[in-house]
Amino acid sequence: MRNASGFLKTAGAPLVSATWLPPSPPPAMPTVAAGPQMERVDNGSQGAPQLFLTSALARGVSGVFVWTALLLTGHQIYSHLRSYTAPREQRFVIRLLFIVPIYAFDSWLSLLLLGGHPYYVYFDSVRDCYEAFVIYSFLTLCFQYLGGESAIMAEIRGKPIRSSCFYGTCCLRGMSYSITFLRFCKQATLQFCIVKPVMALITIILQAFDKYHDGDFNIHSGYLYVTLVYNASVSLALYALFLFYFATRDLLRPFEPVLKFLTIKAIIFLSFWQGMLLAILERCGVIPEVQAVDGTRVGAGTLAAGYQNFLICVEMLFASLALRYAFPSQVYSEKKNSPVPPAPMQSISSGLKETISPQDIVQDAIHNFSPAYQQYTQQSTHEAPGPGQGGHPAPSTHPGPASGSGGGKKSRNIEKRMLIPSEDL
């Protein structure tokens, strides 16, 4: 080969350029545009199978589940507002039903905006704040079913608390039910309504200063501390809800609370624990640390949150079906068609306005956290039971004047609940 090259040099330059240059690799290398193009192709080929969340299939499938759940739940909310005959119950029922639209739509928007900027933090904050609202609303709905604190205390006051490791009452051995127990249940759920919005605001602030990254358990990252506070707060709230159900499950039996209780706890617990599982998988390296989405680098924590949002989009359809059976509107429709309606019908707009107003939560928080907490009285207005109510106790409504029924006003049986003795406080 060396002899051939020497011969070509002596024979003349044109022959060298004609025969030697084509097979040599150096002239093919200096193409400037080839480098970046190949890099993009490689990134796309490597990232495409891993980034299912940004594909049209993932967004389409999640969208179908979300909009189906929205239609089903929207129709159920409308049915309750059309038969808004028990405001003090249905107000909380509708609040519970709104968990599906808020969870589903927020998760879908977070999935659509998955990328380098963690927009999902803002949507998840709204979703998580409503989670606290749901826990409180369910507990208060159970209070309304039973007629309030005074009516509950009339049934359980002085009874010993059964020790059970399954129900988490093993540490309450030798204690009996008192108003302090009910107050603890209320305070434990109300504290979550306060802690969660505060932690959501802190998360947004830390995110703005680049001090918050999902899945980053470093002591210098805000994620660790936000997660610890959130887990402690939600665990306390759910524990209080569980204790209340354990104490009143016999009283709540006519209202079929098991499906209601399991559905609400499944929605909250499932999203909570699957989020924790994804964070652990991300920490263990199962979820890759960095992916590329359209040239944008996405952290593993953001990717784990994307999987969480996709799962929630799918799960909300099944949640909407479960809530449809747990809180049917037919019970109140029968009451509407009875000869003696329990309360004057309200318009859909006024019923919706009453439902979304947080005024009752603020008042309840002030009352239960006040140092001057005293005997709690509650006046319940019970309607004369009409046909088609299935033997259930009539729900309580706002107390009306005790002047009887006259001038076209419907008859009401106003029962003043007894004062809870001060020694129970």
Curated annotation (Swiss-Prot):
GO terms for molecular function: heparin binding. GO terms for biological process: germ-line sex determination; regulation of protein localization; regulation of secretion. Keywords: Cell membrane, Cytoplasm, Cytoplasmic vesicle, Endosome, Membrane, Transmembrane, Transmembrane helix. It is a multi-pass membrane protein. Its main location: membrane. The keyword tRNA-binding does not apply. InterPro entries: Ostalpha/TMEM184C. The chain crosses the membrane at residues 51-71, 96-116, 133-153, 189-209, 226-246, 261-281, 303-323. Residues 375-425 are annotated as: Disordered. Acts as a heparin receptor in vascular cells. May be involved in vesicle transport in exocrine cells and Sertoli cells. Belongs to the TMEM184 family. This is Transmembrane protein 184A.
